[in-house]
Curated annotation (Swiss-Prot):
SMART domains: CA (SM00112)
Spans annotated as Disordered: 1425-1453, 1475-1533, 1714-1865
Main location: membrane
Composition bias, Basic and acidic residues: 1480-1489, 1498-1509
Record disease entry: Defects in Pcdh15 are the cause of the Ames waltzer (av) phenotype. It is characterized by deafness and a balance disorder, associated with the degeneration of inner ear neuroepithelia.
Reported impact of residue 48 to A: Strongly reduced interaction with CDH23
Protein name stated in the entry: Protocadherin-15
C-alpha cells in the first residue's frame, strides 16, 4: 500500500524530469550540427607557420588544419576553399586539410625585388549542414635564408695616410653609409662585418691595419708606417654576413689601396752617403780642403772642398712641395777654437769662405764639425767632419834624395813589373822626391816627368816614394840599357833632373840556331881517323851561360863520327875505316847552358856519303820524280824546290829546264839547282806544269835528268758574278704570302767549294726569302699602304773559308688591291654646341682617308636616331644642325648626344670606317638666381667683432645643377647703401652675412644691406635682396659667467644622459636658450636648451678620441623665436671635456697559440718563451699581469711559471728523461696589474734534447746573430712551414763555432746556432733528419734571405748534427767491462733470492697448518649428520673478470687475518657449548671477541645501498646459523661469520672477483679432497639465515616443530640415495632436487661416517693458506657482500638456499622488481650458472611444512600469492608477465599453498644493487606468511665460470617483544638481543627436514637447467616502525659450510 502511494506520488515528478531531458537532448542535437567548420584545437584562431624562402614547390605548409567536419567521401559535411590567395602561392587539399606551397616556375624569395615576408590566406569552410561559413586565417611567415652574398658598392677603395699618423688612428671610413658592402638578406644574414684578410701579394698589410669595430668597417692604423720602407699597401677587406651558422656565412672581398704619404720624420743627410751594411745609416763623412798659407780671401774664396758640401732632406716626397723644409748649414764646433776668425759657411749654400789669411806657423790644420738642419722648426740635424789643411807657401823647389838611380829589369818581365834596385831583383827601385814646402812625412803631390822612353817606363803618380814600372816588354838582345832623366814639378817649381839608368837583365829567351837545317858532306875512303868532316856553328843571342852552346850527336853516327862539344867540329872517330857507298844521317843538337828548367836547344841533320878517292860517276838527282802543289797566289820569286844533284867527284854541276815551261813561268838556278817562281800563276788558265830538268858536270856522259810535276792549287780569287741578262725590276701583289717575285743567278770560276755560290738577302729578311736556286718569294703578306716598293739586296757568296761575295740590287714594286677601309683622322670627335643655335649651323668638319689607290670616300650618319637632328655632307664631311638644341630638354648630367658616322669607298668592297661623334650641348644660362626671400632680417650685438655671422641669405638658379650657370655666388651691393656695405659683408659661396669690421654701433639702429646673387653662366645673370640688420641692446644679449668651462672628466662608459656639466648665462629680462654651435660634429653630447645641462648623447670611446672642445652659445628666447642668432664675444663659451679612460678592452695576445720547447737538461727557472699581450686602454688598464693555467701534473709539480709582469715563461721542474713529452696550458693576461679584464692564449711546450736539434754554422759572429735572431727565426719558420704548416723553429742556443777534435775548439768569428722545430700537429719535435732536409734543401734561398741581416759575405756554412749526438752514438757502440760486471752481479743476486723466497713460503705454510690443528677438537664436537659428497670441479671454468676494488671494511680482514678470526669464533663456540651461563660468566674473557664484533659492525655501518646512506639508517645484514632444538650440538651452535663486505654502489655493476685469480686453481684441487658423502646434506643443513637491518613483520607466537628423529632418518636415506653422483660431474646433481643413482650411492656409502674427518680436513685446508675452495667458492669472502646486499634490497626475511654442489656465477646486478605473485616450476639444475648480463642465479629451498606462518599485518591489504599443495605439471605454465622467470622441472615440486603477502612498505627508491640476488622458495604451508617471498630456482648451465658469488640467505622475521623466547634458551654474547631465537632455529630446522622429504630422485641424464635472463618478481615488505635487529658480527673468516655459511 505504501509502495503504491509512493509510486503515484513520484509519477508527476518523473514525467516532468523526462520532459526536460527530452528538450535538452534535442537542443543538444541542434548545437552539434554547428560544430562543423570549427577548429578542433585550442589556442588562437589564426594558424601561423613558418617556411624558408626558396623552399621547393609542394612543400607542406600545414599538415592538418584541424577543422571539424569531413570534406571528402560520399557524404561531405564541409567544403573548404582558399580566399585572398594572392599570386596563388598556396594550394589546398580539402580532403586532407593540408596546405602546400605553389612555386611552380618561380621562387619564393624574401629578398628584393620580390620582398615576400609573409603570405596570408583565408581558408573558407562552408558547413553543408547548416550553411554557415567560417574563415580561418593562415599566416605563413617566410624565413630568411642566407642566399645572398654581401656586395661592395665599388670594386676597390683608396685612402691616403701620412707616415707620421699615430697608431690607433682611423685612416679610412669609406664603408659608412651606402659606400660599403650591402646584403639584401634580412636580420643577421644581412648584417655586414668587415675583416682584413691576409694578402699573399702584400703580406704585411694585415699586420699594419686592422678593423677593431667590424660592424663599421673603419680601418685603423695598427703599426707605425714608414714611407722609406713602403709607400703603398694593398689591404684585402672581406665583408661577411653574420649568419648564425658559421659554415653558412657568405663573404666577398675588395681591395683598399692605401698610399703612404711622406712625412717629416727624417732629417737632412750629407752627400755622398755610403750606407752602413744592413742599416739606413750613412758612414761618417769627412770633407777635405787645402789652402795655402798667407793667401788673401780674395785669392782663395770660395774654398774648394772635396767632395762639395751638400745635404738633402731624406723626406724627398713631402706634398705639397711648398711644405718641404729648407736646409741650413753651419759650423758647429772645431779645433783650434779660434776657427771662427778664419772660416765662415753660408747657411743656405754651404759655401766655405776664408775670412783672413792663415799663417801655417800657427795653424797647420783645422778640424771642423758642420751641421745641416731643417729650417721649419723641426731641425733633425745631421753632422759631418771638415778637415782643412794649411799648405806651406810654395817657395822651394822639389828635390830628389839621390843624385842618380840605377835599376834592373828582367827582359822577360811582364808589363806592369816594377824596376828593381838590385841585381837579384828582390827590392824595388825607390825614387823619393820631396818639397821643402811640405813636411817630409806628407805627400808633396809632385808630378814626375821622364824625358825619354815614356812608352817603355812610367812612374807611380802619388806618394812620397815613387816606383818605376814597365809599360811594354823589353828585349835585351835589342837594347841592353836605358838611360833617361826624371824631373819633379810641384806646379810652380821644378827640380833638378836626375839620371836613371835601367839595365835589362838577360833571360834565356833565345834558342841556339843552326844556319842550315841540314848539311850534305862527302868523305872519302882515303881519309884517316881524326880528319875533319864539317864545322858546325850554332848561334844564341843570349849572354853568359844562356849563350854558351854545347854540341852533341844524338843519333845516326853509328860510332864512326865524333863532335867537339865546344867547337862543333865533326871528325872521323878513331879506328874507323870508311867504306865506299856508306851514307850517314847525323842528328846534331846544339844546347845552351842555362839552368835545366830554362834550357833551350835545336837540331840539324848532317848527311855524309862515303866516296872513292877519284871521279867515276855523273851528277845524280836524289830522286827522279818530284811532285808539288803550288798555290796560284804564290808570290814571284818564291823558292819552290831545291833540285840539287850530287857528283861523287865533286865536279861543278850545271842545272837547266829542258822542257815543260814554254812561257818561262819558273826559274832554275844553273849553279844551285833551286827552282823558283818567275811569273804569277793563274789556275783558271793553266792548272798543271810538268818540267824536265837536267844536271850536268860538263862531261859528255855527265848529264842526268829529273821530272818535276807542279799542280797549281786554287785560291778564292774570284767573286761570284750575277747574270746581267736577268730582269732587275720586279713586282708583286700585296696581301699575298709566299708569292713568287723573281729569280737571280750568279757564277764563280773558282774550283771546288770556292766556286759554289750561296744566295742570301742583304735586307728585308722578314719580308722576303730566297731559295738555293735564286728564286725570291714573299715571306709575309705585303701591305702597299705601308710601303709601295722595296730595294732588295741579294748577296751571292762562294763557299770558301774566307768567302768572297757580290751583291745585286733588285727594285720590287708592290701592286695595290682594295684591302683598306677608309679611316677617320680621329676615332672620336667631341664638339661643344651652344644651345639655341639656328638650324643649318655647321659645327664640325670630319675627314676620313683611304690609303688604297683611286679610292673615292663618301660620308653618312650611321645612327638613325639622330638623323633628324644633324646632317652630314656626303663629300665634304661637314656636320650641321637640322634643328635648334635645348640644354634643359636633356636629363640631368646628360646634356650630350653621341652617334656614329661612317666613311666608305664608293667603288670599293671593304667595309666602311666608323667614328664616334659626341655633341655636348652647352648651357647658355637661361635663368637668373632667385632669392628665397626678398627681405631678410638679422640681429647683431653693438660690439660684435669682425667676422660675426648675422644671418644667411639663399638663392637658387633654375639652370641645370652642376653647370656654371647654376652656381650661385653672392656679393654686397655697395652702391645703394654704401655705409652698411662698409661694415657688413656676405660670404661669396655660403651667403652668410657677417660683420666686416668690429662694430661700435648704437643699439636699436637698423641697417639695410643689399645682397646680389649672380651665377657663372654666359651671360652672367643676377638678382638682389635686402637684409635688415637690427643692433640689439647689450642687456638683451646673454653673457656667460665664464669664458671657458672645464667639467670633471667623463668616463667613456658613461651612459646616455649622464650629466657632464652645467653652463649658465645671464641677460636682462630675457629667457635664455642654450645650444652647441661647434665641436659636436659627432653628436656625442647634448645640451638642455633651458637649464644649460650638458649630457652624454651617444657612447664615448677614449681610444677613438680623448677630449672634446665644445663651443656653446646662449641666445635670448626672442632671438630664437625669430629663427635668428646673435653671436657675440659674450654669449659664446668653450667647454673642455676630457674623456676618462675605462677598462673596456680586454688584453689581446700577439698570438693565439705559442709554441716553445724546453731541453731535457734545462735547469730550474730556465727561460722558455716570452708571451706578450697588448691592451688598447691606457695607464694601469694596459699594464698586464700574466698567469698560467696548467692541467694537473704528476707529483703535484707546477711544470712552468710565468713572470707576472714580463710574460716570460720559465721552467718550474726538471725534465730529465721526458723527451717527446709535451705540455699544453693556457696563459692568462689580466690588465690593471691582474685586477681587470683578461685574455688568454694557448701555449705548447715540447720537451726535446739534442737528438732533435741541428746546428746552423754561419761565418758571422754570435753577437750579430743574437741581435738579428728574431728576423732570422722568422725566415727559418717560413721554410719549415712550407713542409709542415704551423711548425715553429725554436732557438736553443747561440754560441761560438765549435770545431776540432770532439768540438773542443771555439771560433768567435763564426757562430753555432742550435735550433729545433716543433710540429703543432704532433706537439713534438720534428725529426732531426727531417729538419735537416727542410733546411739544407733550401740553403741557397735561406742564405739569400739572411744576406740583409748577415751583411756582405755573411752566409750559412753548413748544417750539422750537435756534438752530443755524435758522442752518444760512439758511447753506445760498445759495452764496457763495468756494465757487464754489474749485470752479472744482478743475475747472481736474483738466483740467490729464489731459494730464500721458497723457504719463507714453506715456513708460512707450516705455520698455517699448526693453526688449523687448534680447531680440530671443536670441529669434532660440532659434527653433524653425514652430508652428501660435493660435486666435482668444473672441467673448464671461465676466466675470471678483473677484480674490483675491495669493499669498505675489508681492512679488518687484512688486519686480523683469517686464522685470528677463525680462532675467535672457535673460542666463542666452546664457550657456548659449556651451558647457558657460559657467556655471562665469562664475559670478561671474551672482551676481545666482543670488541671485534663491535668494530666489525661499526665498519659496516657506513655502507649504503643507493647513494650515501643516512647515518640513522645503516643496512648491514646479520647472518646466523640455526639448527633444531633437539640437536644438542646445534642448540649451542655459535655464530661463526657472515662474510659481508660492504660495497659502494658505484661499483655495483662489477661483481667481486677478489682473490679469484690467485686462489681459484689451488682451491679447486683442495676441494676435491674435501668432498665426502655427507658434504651435500651437511651444507644444506647448515644454511645460514640472513637478517637485514630493517624493521620486520611480527614473528609467530610460537614455533612449529617436527620430529627430529624422523627427519634425521629421512635425511640420511636421501643422503644415501644421492651418493650416486659421480665425482667428475660436479654441478650435475642437486641435493635438494635430484637423487643419485644406486651405483654411486653404494660406491660412496662408506663415507657417511667421515663427516668429522672431512670437516677437520676442511678446516686444515682453510687454515693452511686457502681461504676459499672451489666447492665453497660461492660462499667466498669476495662474493658474500654482493649477495647479502642483494637480499637486503630485494626481499623480505626469507630462507634462500643454494645447493653446495652447484657452482652458481652471479650475473651483474639488476634493480629489484616488486611483484605480487609468482608461480614457478622447478627442474633439476646442472648447477653451473650462466654469466649473461643482467641475470641472477639462485635456488629455492622450501620451508618445512610444519612451520606456522606468522600472523599477517592487520591494517595493510596484500595481494595473495597462490601456491599449490600438489605437484606442478611438467608443462610450463602460462607465460608470466615481463621480468618473471619460469622454471620447468622434470620432477614434481613440493606442494605449496597460497600465501598472501603483506603489502609493500613505503621504501626509499631502490638503488642499483651491487650484485645479483637470490630468492628462496616460500615454505609449503597453507597459513599465510608475512616473512617470506618466493622466487624460482635458477636454471644453471655447465658453461658458467666460477660461482664464487652465489650464496644462500635466510631472513627470518624479527620477533615481537611481547611474545618472548623460550625460557631454557638465553642468547649469549652478541646474540643476546635476538628475540625468539629458538623459534627461528626450529623453523629453519623443520624447513630443511621438509626439503629432504620432498626431493624425490631424478634421472641424472635429465639434469640440465638453463639460467634465465630475468629475475622473477618479488615482494619487499618493510616497516619503519618495527624495531631493528641488533648488530651482529659480520665475520670475515671463511669457515666450512658444515658450521656456518653466510652471505
Amino acid at each position: 500500500m505504501f509502495l503504491q502511494f509512493a509510486v503515484w506520488k513520484c509519477l508527476p515528478h518523473g514525467i516532468l524530469i523526462a520532459s526536460l531531458l527530452v528538450v535538452s537532448w534535442g537542443q543538444y542535437d541542434d548545437d552539434w550540427q554547428y560544430e562543423d567548420c570549427k577548429l578542433a584545437r585550442g589556442g588562437p584562431p589564426a594558424t601561423i607557420v613558418a617556411i624558408d624562402e626558396e623552399s621547393r614547390n609542394g612543400t607542406i605548409l600545414v599538415d592538418n588544419m584541424l577543422i571539424k567536419g569531413t570534406a571528402g567521401g560520399p557524404d561531405p559535411t564541409i567544403e573548404l576553399s582558399l580566399k585572398d590567395n594572392v599570386d596563388y602561392w598556396v594550394l589546398l587539399d580539402p580532403v586532407k586539410q593540408m596546405l602546400f606551397l605553389n612555386s611552380t616556375g618561380r621562387v619564393l624569395d624574401r629578398d628584393p625585388p620580390m620582398n615576400i615576408h609573409s603570405i596570408v590566406v583565408q581558408v573558407q569552410c562552408v558547413n553543408k549542414k547548416v550553411g554557415t561559413v567560417i574563415y580561418h586565417e593562415v599566416r605563413i611567415v617566410v624565413r630568411d635564408r642566407n642566399d645572398n652574398s654581401p656586395t661592395f658598392k665599388h670594386e676597390s677603395y683608396y685612402a691616403t695616410v701620412n707616415e707620421l699618423t699615430p697608431v690607433g688612428t682611423t685612416i679610412f671610413t669609406g664603408f659608412s653609409g651606402d659606400n660599403g658592402a650591402t646584403d639584401i638578406d634580412d636580420g643577421p644574414n644581412g648584417q655586414i662585418e668587415y675583416v682584413i684578410q691576409y694578402n699573399p701579394e702584400d703580406p704585411t698589410s694585415n699586420d699594419t691595419f686592422e678593423i677593431p669595430l667590424m660592424l663599421t668597417g673603419n680601418v685603423v692604423l695598427r703599426k707605425r708606417l714608414n714611407y722609406e720602407d713602403k709607400t703603398r699597401y694593398y689591404v684585402i677587406i672581406q665583408a661577411n654576413d653574420r649568419a648564425q651558422n658559421l659554415n653558412e656565412r657568405r663573404t666577398t672581398t675588395t681591395t683598399l689601396t692605401v698610399d703612404v704619404l711622406d712625412g717629416d720624420d727624417l732629417g737632412p743627410m750629407f752627400l755622398p752617403c755610403v750606407l752602413v751594411p744592413n742599416t739606413r745609416d750613412c758612414r761618417p763623412l769627412t770633407y777635405q780642403a787645402a789652402i795655402p798659407e798667407l793667401r788673401t780671401p780674395e785669392e782663395l774664396n770660395p774654398i774648394l772642398v772635396t767632395p762639395p758640401i751638400q745635404a738633402i732632406d731624406q723626406d724627398r716626397n713631402i706634398q705639397p712641395p711648398s711644405d718641404r723644409p729648407g736646409i741650413l748649414y753651419s759650423i758647429l764646433v772645431g779645433t783650434p777654437e779660434d776657427y771662427p776668425r778664419f772660416f765662415h759657411m753660408h747657411p743656405r749654400t754651404a759655401e766655405l769662405t776664408l775670412l783672413e789669411p792663415v799663417n801655417r806657423d800657427f795653424h797647420q790644420k783645422f778640424d771642423l764639425v758642420i751641421k745641416a738642419e731643417q729650417d721649419n722648426g723641426h731641425p733633425l740635424p745631421a753632422f759631418a767632419s771638415l778637415h782643412i789643411e794649411i799648405l806651406d807657401e810654395n817657395n822651394q823647389s822639389p828635390y830628389f834624395t839621390m843624385p842618380s838611380y840605377q835599376g834592373y829589369i828582367l827582359e822577360s818581365a811582364p808589363v806592369g813589373a816594377t824596376i828593381s834596385e838590385s841585381l837579384n831583383l828582390t827590392t824595388p827601385l825607390r825614387i823619393v822626391a820631396l818639397d821643402k814646402d811640405i813636411e817630409d812625412t806628407k805627400d808633396p803631390e809632385l808630378h814626375l816627368f821622364l824625358n825619354d822612353y815614356t812608352s817603355v817606363f812610367t812612374v807611380t803618380p802619388t806618394g812620397i816614394t815613387r816606383y818605376l814600372t814597365l809599360l811594354q816588354p823589353v828585349d835585351r838582345e835589342e837594347q841592353q840599357t836605358y838611360t833617361f832623366l826624371i824631373t819633379a814639378f810641384d806646379g810652380v817649381q821644378e827640380s833638378e833632373p836626375v839620371v836613371v839608368n835601367i839595365r835589362v837583365m838577360d833571360a834565356n829567351d833565345n834558342t841556339p840556331t843552326f844556319p842550315e837545317i841540314s848539311y850534305d858532306v862527302y868523305v872519302y875512303t882515303d881519309m884517316s881517323p881524326g880528319d875533319s868532316v864539317i864545322q858546325l856553328t850554332a848561334v844564341d843571342a843570349d849572354e853568359g851561360s844562356n849563350g854558351e852552346i854545347s854540341y852533341e850527336i844524338l843519333v845516326g853516327g853509328k860510332g864512326d863520327f865524333v863532335i867537339n862539344k865546344t867547337t862543333g867540329l865533326v871528325s872521323i872517330a878513331p879506328g874507323v875505316e870508311l867504306i865506299v857507298g856508306q851514307t850517314y844521317a847525323l842528328t846534331v843538337q846544339a844546347s845552351d847552358n842555362a839552368p835545366p828548367a830554362e834550357r833551350r836547344h835545336s837540331i840539324c841533320t848532317v848527311y855524309i856519303e862515303v866516296l872513292p878517292p877519284n871521279n867515276q860517276s855523273p851528277p845524280r838527282f836524289p830522286q827522279l820524280m818530284y811532285s808539288l802543289e803550288v798555290s796560284e797566289a804564290m808570290r814571284i820569286g818564291a823558292i819552290l824546290l831545291n833540285l840539287q844533284a850530287t857528283d861523287r867527284e865533286g865536279d861543278p854541276i850545271t842545272y837547266a829546264i829542258e822542257n815543260g815551261d814554254p812561257q818561262r813561268v819558273f826559274n832554275l838556278s844553273e849553279t844551285t839547282g833551286i827552282l823558283s817562281l818567275g811569273k804569277a800563276l793563274d789556275r783558271e788558265s793553266t792548272d798543271r806544269y810538268i818540267l824536265i830538268v837536267t844536271a850536268s858536270d860538263g862531261r859528255p856522259d855527265g848529264t842526268s835528268t829529273a821530272t818535276v810535276n807542279i799542280v797549281v792549287t786554287d785560291v778564292n780569287d774570284n767573286a761570284p758574278v750575277f747574270d746581267p741578262y736577268l730582269p732587275r725590276n720586279l713586282s708583286v701583289v700585296e696581301e699575298e704570302a709566299n708569292a713568287f717575285v723573281g729569280q737571280v743567278r750568279a757564277t764563280d770560276p773558282d774550283a771546288g767549294i770556292n766556286g759554289q755560290v750561296h744566295y742570301s738577302l742583304g735586307n728585308f729578311n722578314n719580308l722576303f726569302r730566297i731559295t738555293s736556286n735564286g728564286s725570291i718569294y714573299t715571306a709575309v703578306k705585303l701591305n702597299r699602304e705601308a710601303r709601295d716598293h722595296y730595294e732588295l739586296v741579294v748577296v751571292a757568296t762562294d763557299g770558301a773559308v774566307h768567302p768572297r761575295h757580290s751583291t745585286l740590287t733588285l727594285y720590287i714594286k708592290v701592286l695595290d688591291i682594295d684591302d683598306n677601309s677608309p679611316v677617320f683622322t680621329n676615332s672620336t670627335y667631341t664638339v661643344v654646341v651652344e644651345e639655341n643655335l639656328p638650324a643649318g649651323t655647321s659645327f664640325l668638319q670630319i675627314e676620313a682617308k683611304d690609303v688604297d689607290l683611286g679610292a673615292n670616300v663618301s660620308y653618312r650618319i650611321r645612327s638613325p636616331e639622330v638623323k633628324h637632328l644633324f646632317a652630314l655632307h656626303p663629300f665634304t664631311g661637314e656636320l650641321s644642325l637640322l634643328r635648334s638644341l635645348d640644354y634643359e630638354a636633356f636629363p640631368d648630367q646628360e646634356a650630350s648626344i653621341t652617334f656614329l658616322v661612317e666613311a666608305f669607298d664608293i667603288y670599293g668592297t671593304m667595309p666602311p670606317g666608323i667614328a664616334t661623334v659626341t655633341v655636348i650641348v652647352k648651357d647658355m644660362n637661361d635663368y637668373p638666381p632667385v632669392f628665397s626671400k626678398r627681405i631678410y632680417k638679422g640681429m647683431v650685438a653693438p660690439d660684435a667683432v669682425k667676422g660675426t655671422p648675422i644671418t644667411t641669405v639663399y638663392a637658387e638658379d633654375a639652370d641645370p645643377p652642376g653647370m656654371p650657370a647654376s652656381r650661385v655666388r653672392y656679393r654686397v651691393d655697395d652702391v645703394q647703401f654704401p655705409y652698411p656695405a662698409s661694415i657688413f659683408d656676405v660670404e661669396e659661396d655660403s651667403g652668410r652675412v657677417v660683420t666686416r669690421v668690429n662694430l661700435n654701433e648704437e643699439p636699436t639702429t637698423i641697417f639695410k644691406l643689399v645682397v646680389v646673387a649672380f651665377d657663372d653662366g654666359e651671360p652672367v645673370m643676377s638678382s638682389s635682396a635686402t637684409v635688415r640688420i637690427l643692433v640689439l641692446h647689450p642687456g638683451e644679449i646673454p653673457r656667460f659667467t665664464q669664458e671657458e668651462y672645464r667639467p670633471p672628466p667623463v668616463s667613456e662608459l658613461a651612459a646616455r644622459g649622464t650629466v657632464v656639466g652645467v653652463i649658465s648665462a645671464a641677460a636682462i629680462n630675457q629667457s635664455i636658450v642654450y645650444s652647441i654651435v661647434a665641436g659636436n660634429e659627432e653628436d656625442k653630447f647634448g645640451i638642455n636648451n633651458v637649464t644649460g645641462v650638458i649630457y652624454v648623447n651617444s657612447p664615448l670611446d677614449y681610444e677613438t678620441r680623448t677630449s672634446y672642445v665644445l663651443r656653446v652659445q646662449a641666445d635670448s628666447l626672442e632671438v630664437v623665436l625669430a629663427n635668428l642668432r646673435v653671436p657675440s664675444k659674450s654669449n659664446t663659451a668653450k667647454v673642455y671635456i676630457e674623456i676618462q679612460d675605462e677598462n673596456d678592452h680586454p688584453p689581446v695576445f700577439q698570438k693565439k697559440f705559442y709554441i716553445g720547447g724546453v731541453s731535457e737538461d734545462a735547469r730550474m727557472f730556465a727561460s722558455v718563451l716570452r708571451v706578450k699581450a697588448t691592451d688598447r686602454d691606457t695607464g694601469n688598464y694596459s699594464a698586464m699581469a700574466y698567469r698560467l693555467i696548467i692541467p694537473p701534473i704528476k707529483e703535484g709539480k707546477e711544470g712552468f711559471v710565468v713572470e707576472t709582469y714580463t710574460g716570460l715563461i720559465k721552467t718550474a721542474m726538471l725534465f730529465h728523461n721526458m723527451r717527446r713529452s709535451y705540455f699544453k696550458f693556457q696563459v692568462i693576461a689580466t690588465d690593471d696589474y691582474g685586477k681587470g679584464l683578461s685574455g688568454k692564449a694557448d701555449v705548447l711546450v715540447s720537451v726535446v734534447n739534442q737528438l732533435d736539434m741541428q746546428v746552423i754554422v754561419s761565418n758571422v759572429p754570435p753577437t750579430l746573430v743574437e741581435k738579428k735572431i728574431e728576423d732570422l727565426t722568422e725566415i727559418l719558420d717560413r721554410y719549415v712551414q712550407e713542409q709542415i704548416p704551423g711548425a715553429k723553429v725554436v732557438v736553443e742556443s747561440i754560441g761560438a763555432r765549435r770545431h776540432g777534435d770532439a768540438y773542443s775548439l771555439e771560433d768567435y768569428s763564426k757562430c753555432d746556432l742550435t735550433v729545433y722545430a716543433i710540429d703543432p700537429q704532433t706537439n713534438r719535435a720534428i725529426d732531426r733528419n727531417e729538419l735537416f732536409k727542410f733546411l739544407d734543401g733550401k740553403l741557397l734561398d735561406i742564405n739569400k734571405d739572411f744576406q740583409p741581416y748577415y751583411g756582405e759575405g755573411g752566409r750559412i756554412l753548413e748544417i750539422r748534427t750537435p756534438e752530443a749526438v755524435t758522442s752518444i752514438k760512439k758511447r753506445g757502440e760498445s759495452l764496457g767491462y763495468t756494465e757487464g760486471a754489474l749485470l752479472a752481479l744482478a743475475f747472481i743476486i736474483i738466483l740467490c733470492c729464489i731459494p730464500a723466497i721458497l723457504v719463507v713460503l714453506v715456513s708460512y705454510r707450516q705455520f698455517k697448518v699448526r693453526q688449523a690443528e687448534c680447531t680440530k677438537t671443536a670441529r669434532i664436537q660440532s659434527a653433524m649428520p653425514a652430508a652428501k659428497p660435493a660435486a666435482p670441479v668444473p672441467a673448464a671454468p671461465a676466466p675470471p673478470p678483473p677484480p674490483p676494488p675491495p669493499p669498505p671494511g675489508a681492512h679488518l680482514y687484512e688486519e686480523l687475518g683469517e686464522s685470528a678470526m677463525h680462532n675467535l669464533f672457535l673460542l666463542y663456540h666452546f664457550e657456548q657449548s659449556r651451558g647457558n651461563n657460559s657467556v655471562p660468566e665469562d664475559r670478561s674473557s671474551h672482551r676481545d671477541g666482543m670488541a671485534f664484533s663491535s668494530s666489525t659492525t661499526e665498519s659496516h655501518e657506513p655502507a649504503h645501498v643507493e647513494g650515501p646512506l643516512k647515518e640513522s639508517q645503516p643496512n648491514p645484514a646479520r647472518t646466523f646459523s640455526f639448527v633444531p632444538d633437539e640437536d644438542n650440538l646445534s642448540t649451542h651452535n655459535p655464530l661463526y661469520m657472515e662474510s659481508i663486505g660492504q660495497r659502494s654502489t658505484n661499483s655495483d655493476l662489477q661483481p667481486r672477483t677478489d682473490f679469484e685469480e690467485l686462489l681459484a686453481p689451488r682451491t679447486q684441487v683442495k676441494s676435491q679432497s674435501l668432498r665426502g658423502p655427507r658434504e651435500k646434506i651437511q651444507r644444506v643443513w647448515n644454511q645460514s639465515v640472513s637478517f637485514p637491518r630493517r624493521l620486520m613483520w611480527k614473528a609467530p607466537n610460537r614455533p612449529e616443530t617436527i620430529d627430529l628423529v624422523e627427519w634425521q632418518i629421512t635425511n640420511q636415506r636421501a643422503e644415501c640415495e644421492s651418493a650416486r653422483c659421480h665425482p667428475s660431474q660436479r654441478g650435475s646433481s642437486n641435493v635438494l632436487l635430484a637423487t643419485e643413482d644406486a651405483h654411486e650411492s653404494e660406491k660412496e656409502g662408506g663415507h657417511r661416517d667421515t663427516l668429522i674427518v672431512q670437516q677437520t680436513e676442511q678446516l686444515k685446508s682453510l687454515s693452511s693458506g686457502s681461504s676459499f675452495s672451489s666447492s665453497w667458492s660461492h660462499f667466498s669472502f669476495s662474493t658474500l657482500p654482493t649477495i647479502s646486499r642483494a637480499v637486503e634490497l630485494g626481499s623480505e626475511p626469507n630462507v634462500v638456499t643454494s645447493p653446495a654442489d652447484c657452482t652458481l656465477e652471479l650475473s651483474p646486478p639488476l634493480r629489484p622488481r616488486i611483484l605480487n605473485s609468482l608461480s614457478s616450476k622447478r627442474e633439476t639444475p646442472t648447477c653451473a650458472s650462466d654469466t649473461e648480463p643482467k641475470r641472477n642465479s639462485f635456488e629455492i629451498a622450501p620451508h618445512p611444512p610444519s612451520i606456522s606462518a606468522p600472523l599477517p599485518h592487520p591494517p595493510l591489504p596484500r595481494p595473495p600469492i597462490a601456491f599449490t599443495t600438489f605437484p606442478l605439471p611438467l608443462s610450463p605454465p602460462n607465460p608470466p608477465p615481463p621480468q618473471l622467470v619460469t622454471f620447468s622441472l622434470p620432477i614434481s615440486t613440493p606442494p605449496t599453498s597460497s600465501l598472501p603477502l603483506p603489502p609493500p612498505l613505503s621504501l626509499p627508491p631502490p638503488p642499483r644493487p651491487p650484485a645479483p640476488r637470490l630468492f628462496p622458495q616460500p615454505p609449503s604451508t597453507s597459513i599465510p606468511s608475512t616473512d617470506s617471498i618466493s622466487a624460482p630456482a635458477a636454471k644453471c648451465t655447465a658453461s658458467a665460470t666460477h660461482a664464487r658469488e652465489t650464496t644462500s640467505t635466510t631472513q627470518p622475521p624479527a620477533s615481537n617483544p611481547q611474545w618472548g623466547a623460550e625460557p631454557h634458551r638465553h642468547p649469549k654474547g652478541i646474540l643476546r638481543h635476538v628475540k625468539n631465537l629458538a623459534e627461528l632455529e626450529k623453523s629453519v630446522s623443520n624447513m630443511y627436514s621438509h626439503i629432504e622429504k620432498n626431493c624425490p630422485p631424478a634421472d641424472p641424464s635429465k639434469l640440465h637447467t638453463f639460467c634465465p635472463a630475468e629475475k622473477t618478481g618479488m615482494k619487499i615488505t618493510h616497516d619503519q616502525s618495527q624495531e631493528t635487529l641488533v648488530r651482529v658480527v659480520e665475520g670475515i673468516d671463511v669457515q666450512p659450510h658444515s658450521q656456518s655459511t653466510s652471505l
